[in-house]
Amino acid sequence: MQHLALRATQALSILAIGWLAPAGVAMAEYHYSPQYETCMDKVDLGALKNSQWAACADQELKKVDAALNTYYRKLQQQLEPEQREALKKSQRAWLQYREARCSFEALGPVAPGGAASQSLCMLEMTAQKADYLRDLLP
């Protein structure tokens, strides 16, 4: 049940980002792996649920981060030098923002809090960025 509430919170975050996106920008949703879905479904909702959620998210983050890096490299190869430099600058700024935001979520009033919030934030933001880079590819 809490897994569903957590997924609803993630979905609302994605919807909010969609409303903020400029008109005409396609917002595809990242599809998490079946292993991640299975891991989240197996979380025991007892006292250790937050560490289990964090472990699932951390494991999936490795896959999503690899996809993001693949899209980034492919896009870099297709850009002009000035565009490549702008993309690199943008990516560096985004990495700093992601770290700061997810560190805040670990400390902030957002449920579930702690390492689980930080891991889930990292996963969600990385998936969104991977989608963005993928959608820029021809």
Report each predicted region and the residues it spans:
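C-terminal segment of classical bacterial N-terminal signal peptides
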Residues: 17-25
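N-terminal alpha-helical modules
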Residues: 24-138
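Bacterial N-terminal signal peptides that target proteins for export
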Residues: 2-13, 19
